[in-house]
Amino acid sequence: MEPSLLMWGFFTFTMIPGCMAGACVQQPPSLRNATFKILGYKVGTTLNCDCQRGFRRDPSSGPYMICRGNSSHSFWENKCQCMPTSSPRIPVKQVTPRPEEQKERKTTETQGQMQPPNQANLPGHCKEPPPWEHESLKRVYHFMEGQTVRYQCLPGFRDGSAQNNSAQSVCKKQEDQEVMRWTQPKLKCKSEKENGSFPEPQMSTAAPPTTKTSLPTRTKGTTDSQNLTEVPATMQPIIFTTQYQLAVAGCVLLLLSILLLSGLTWQRRR
């Protein structure tokens, strides 16, 4: 092994554990149908300088970036750089992510970390570190004690926990333990379609109103040019019953009989 690699391994072995003291090695908890955002990174937070497939970290840069400073001024120390893994003489082909990598990236963007568009200048905190060329699809942080992340439900979901401070997780030392762990957030994102949030339209059971038409009636002493008074009248259909038809037929027969008798009487008188 080359002496430079041995020295670099010794540096990594001696420096990184000191930087990781009092830090949460694991990433914040993942919640279903939710994402988390970070308003600022506490001083001492580190970010691994990971590269995409086909690239590796440039030996001239450090293995990670670290947030340095104090309550009045803070900044990211070191810059991550990636270089091709192949020889510089051979042109490097652009590596197309495999389907599983694209799926992993989509899942990370949906359920992973979401940065607010405008980060506040919190005392003793660094903003989101700048990106570097050919960096890995997923960033790996090592958060310090007291770091807080806040969760929120994805669009189409709402918080059903009904508890205060249920949407945050804090990096803190557990009781009777020396390691740092994240507290479990109690946020429960439920679909907005549950519990009748979107009521279905109900069918009306009321009877339809009676259809009425307004017939104009002319009042006494008015002309055609004057307003007509509208009187509501209910239109009822005319029904010819059997009794009515028999009465009409009887009247017709009686009239014919009278005419016939009158004709006979008139002939006899002649």
UniProtKB/Swiss-Prot annotation:
Disulfide bonds join 24-67, 49-80, 51-82, 126-171, 153-189. It is a single-pass type I membrane protein. Residues 1-21 form the signal peptide. Residues 265-270 are cytoplasmic. InterPro entries: IL-2_rcpt_alpha (IPR015486), Sushi/SCR/CCP_sf (IPR035976), Sushi_SCR_CCP_dom (IPR000436). One of its GO terms (molecular function) is interleukin-2 receptor activity. Keywords: Disulfide bond, Glycoprotein, Immunity, Membrane, Receptor, Repeat, Signal, Sushi, Transmembrane, Transmembrane helix. It comes from the Eukaryota. Residues 87-124, 190-225 are annotated as: Disordered. The chain crosses the membrane at residues 246-264. GO terms for cellular component: membrane. One of its GO terms (biological process) is immune system process. SUPFAM superfamilies: Complement control module/SCR domain. Residues 112-121, 202-225 have a biased composition (Polar residues). Residues 22-84, 124-191 form the Sushi domain. Its main location: membrane. Residues 22-245 are extracellular. Glycans are attached at residues 33, 70, 164, 195, 227. It is found in: Membrane. CDD domains: CCP. Residues 98-108 have a biased composition (Basic and acidic residues). Receptor for interleukin-2. The receptor is involved in the regulation of immune tolerance by controlling regulatory T cells (TREGs) activity. TREGs suppress the activation and expansion of autoreactive T-cells. Non-covalent dimer of an alpha and a beta subunit. IL2R exists in 3 different forms: a high affinity dimer, an intermediate affinity monomer (beta subunit), and a low affinity monomer (alpha subunit). The high and intermediate affinity forms also associate with a gamma subunit. PANTHER family: INTERLEUKIN-2 RECEPTOR ALPHA CHAIN (PTHR10573), INTERLEUKIN-2 RECEPTOR SUBUNIT ALPHA (PTHR10573:SF0). This is Interleukin-2 receptor subunit alpha. It comes from Sus scrofa.
